[in-house]
Amino acid sequence: MAPVLSKDVADIESILALNPRTQSRATLRSTLAKKLDKKHWKRNPDKNCFNCEKLENNFDDIKHTTLGERGALREAMRCLKCADAPCQKSCPTNLDIKSFITSISNKNYYGAAKMIFSDNPLGLTCGMVCPTSDLCVGGCNLYATEEGPINIGGLQQYATEVFKAMNIPQIRNPSLPPPEKMPEAYSAKIALLGAGPASISCASFLARLGYNDITIFEKQEYVGGISTSEIPQFRLPYDVVNFEIELMKDLGVKIICGKSLSVNDITLSTLKEEGYKAAFIGIGLPEPKKDHIFQGLTQDQGFYTSKDFLPLVAKSSKAGMCACHSPLLSIRGTVIVLGAGDTAFDCATSALRCGARRVFIVFRKGFVNIRAVPEEVELAREEKCEFLPFLSPRKVIVKGGRIVAMQFVRTEQDETGKWNEDGDQIACLKADVVISAFGSVLSDPKVKEALSPIKFNRWDLPEVDPETMQTSEPWVFAGGDVVGIANTTVEAVNDGKQASWYIHRYIQSQYGASVSAKPELPLFYTPIDLVDISVEMAALKFTNPFGLASATPTTSSSMIRRAFEAGWAFALTKTFSLDKDIVTNVSPRIIRGTTSGPMYGPGQSSFLNIELISEKTAAYWCQSVTELKADFPDNIVIASIMCSYNRNDWMELSRKAEASGADALELNLSCPHGMGERGMGLACGQDPELVRNICRWVRQAVRIPFFAKLTPNVTDIVSIARAAKEGGANGVTATNTVSGLMGLKADGTPWPAVGREKRTTYGGVSGTAIRPIALRAVTTIARALPEFPILATGGIDSAESGLQFLHGGASVLQVCSAIQNQDFTIIQDYCTGLKALLYLKSIEELQDWDGQSPATKSHQKGKPVPCIAELVGKKLPSFGPYLEKCKKIIAEEKLRLKKENVTVLPLERNHFIPKKPIPSVKDVIGKALQYLGTYGELNNTEQVVAVIDEEMCINCGKCYMTCNDSGYQAIQFDPETHLPTVTDTCTGCTLCLSVCPIIDCIKMVSRTTPYEPKRGLPLAVNPVS
């Protein structure tokens, strides 16, 4: 009996065991069985913790906000990039959050980092530790939606971490003269006391302004202030602090350690005697607040203040902080942490990593009065710290020279809001260690004396003007904790930033110079910003390759003016005609596309329009061109014109446009709707003969360059481009919109629907949805007509996508839909993005990057995955019993590492230097053409197969399902672990990679065995006749 070919064989049936099937009946399974099922597949922590995760010596990142590239891109795309963004108003350093998230969504991580560091020199630190829920995130407009606010801190951290990996130095503002040619005032000696966030920020901005004799004095042998000594490694790694300090040192700032503010060392008086013209005090609050009940208690007895405890933990957990290796502080038994601020929660979670069995966080007020940010509170709760509110410490009980317990009294709030202690309600809590985290003060008399003669306020802190950060001594400024205004790292950074401008103003005044009334601090610069992205085309010089397409962004000339002011290099006017062909538009006429699915807001992948050409007259546009060229001589203005197939009309209109001063013309031969019915636009652009003749007419009429705008709504676009070239065109624009019908509602009516009759017509589809069509048009023209200029348009929404068109043979790039999604300011992102892409091509150490995307390392939730397979010989999924086993293995490994005596060398930062010439825009034009050809030129003997990274796999089975129902049934799916395995029947089709939700979890690698296609039945052998 012949086999049944249309039935799966037994081996395939086995593979298909877990493949989805349509449901035909209800499913029955007992509650007990479901409880067991739930336990097996559970990924989040069990609320009944009988055997909590062991965290001793585990200083791995625990932040919920941390993102990998996938998470960062999705979150950035979700951001609305609002007008007058409230998030920015809530950021102490005034970060342009809208702009840096725009850059992240466009995979321009350098552009994002540049925006961040321009306003915050400690942008990576703040991305990690900022209490964003109380700052920028608190103002996010998406709080008004179901999905909630944007993870701004995580995005900030991701972008700046990618820049950190680029290993590129900060440079002086390129517009400044060399240091030796700067005015004398910029050589003034400036001293900063304390190497914490406020001083690093202040010194960075002063150096960016051009000052070249800046010294920071730090009393410790390490730098970074509390970022180094008190914020734990699992929240803020030391290499991050060191990186930002190195960026500051790139500008020539000097740091001298082991020098303290004290009558026995440095004083304001000695600084003045040594010739310092200005000083900044950023020493923080170095002494702990200590309740009288702790007098006489020592660390040997089990008592620590946060100022004792956290630095001890830091020295043993922060690699590179100091050359010596300090063993991790060992704590056993029960720990009581007193306080409800961020520091108290840092102490609690750090105590667990020092070996504490249980940690109680005890505070005087209730949960609603906890001062710590929600992020810290949630982390402590997840790590099973216990919270005890409404208790005030009364007494420490010591036996045998060790703390054994603490006595508390109950606190209550009366009707007036005053908190009182109730001595009748006493609680006693057994404990082995007590950590007091009641805050910090400035109490050392030697330090205060060293600050003489500045005045102190009623809180015994230096008195400063909160606007200028100036003390009672005009040459002395202060910021950060020591002033008592800043409560967070980011606020301390802003104090230093604020002070830098007024130090600048003060110093300049001492040298008889003045500064602008409005503060103007320089941006952050690197060698990337020096990359030249200008390009020449048809004897026209473009400052960058990005311009406005003849479309909605050029509805009026005033809009073009604003675009030029923003940085766009060129613009095409909205297409205009002779007055006899003037149009009136219908409405509605521009709608969102359906190609993005149910995604609302910006980031649309397509738009459809049934808008005609400009409703404004030729006279308006000609005068506008004249005005724009007068005010923006370095910008290119291209007049976009349209006529019917009439020689006289084309010659008349093109001469008018040339006379207006336009640099070039674009002949719109491609409008896909409306105009074609008038014998214009598409009606002219689909016939090579008509195109050739129109171009000949225009060539006879004008001397300036002109370009024919082509339609993609043809069978052979090359024949149209060739006709334009033969007619004398200097190049072509490829392509205009694709004719389409975007959608029909459930009742059958279209959208857009015009008038009472709800009628519509086929419109022009634009946006990233048509990019494949536009790329094909550009590359086919470039291959057929080498060196023939192409103005690309069609889905260009980033520097990365723009580079694709340049590689495809385009010379300059026109943008429309991306502006409809956002605004004119995206040009800043495009320029920095293209500069970065070109610069990184010259760095040999980054050749495994894809543009600005680093090579993907195995990770889960954006955090590195421990190599479990190396420890136990096999890979395990991250859920249920396997996750618990992973945690146990990691805990054992951390304990093993704790016992090793590891010597850590100081961190060194050696910048990546370009080993190859940085390519120009001209150098990359057409680079991809060598890879394009016919199907017959492809090699079918060099095959690939899929390989799945099981450590990154999230076990969704998408690869398995698409392979089953759309491919070759070549992936097995384990019923217990849900780990997919690619079999040797893989054909390398790449569908699995295409639907995988995790970047680089699946990779295609070269096949090592010969590929033998499955023919179903053997090939018939026909005899030779």
From Swiss-Prot:
Positions contributing to substrate binding: N609, N668, L669, S670, N736, T737
Top EC class, one word: oxidoreductase
Active site residues of this protein: C671
Keyword Transmembrane helix: no
Binding positions ([4Fe-4S] cluster 3): C953, C956, C959, C963
Activation and inhibition: Inactivated by 5-iodouracil.
Annotated residues for binding of [4Fe-4S] cluster 4: C986, C989, C992, C996
Sites where the protein binds FAD: 129, 194-198, 218-226, 235, 261, 480-489
Positions of NADP(+) binding: 340-343, 364-365, 371, 437-439, 481-487
A cellular component annotation (GO) from this entry: cytosol
Catalysis: reaction(s): 5,6-dihydrouracil + NADP(+) = uracil + NADPH + H(+); 5,6-dihydrothymine + NADP(+) = thymine + NADPH + H(+)
Keyword field: 4Fe-4S, Acetylation, Cytoplasm, FAD, Flavoprotein, FMN, Iron, Iron-sulfur, Metal-binding, NADP, Nucleotide-binding, Oxidoreductase, Repeat
Residues annotated as binding [4Fe-4S] cluster 2: C91, C130, C136, Q156
Subcellular location: Cytoplasm
MF-aspect GO terms: 4 iron, 4 sulfur cluster binding; dihydropyrimidine dehydrogenase (NADP+) activity; metal ion binding; NADP binding; protein homodimerization activity; uracil binding
Family as reported in the entry's similarity comment: Belongs to the dihydropyrimidine dehydrogenase family.
Subunit annotation: Homodimer.
The protein's name in its UniProt record: Dihydropyrimidine dehydrogenase [NADP(+)]
Organism of this sequence: Bos taurus
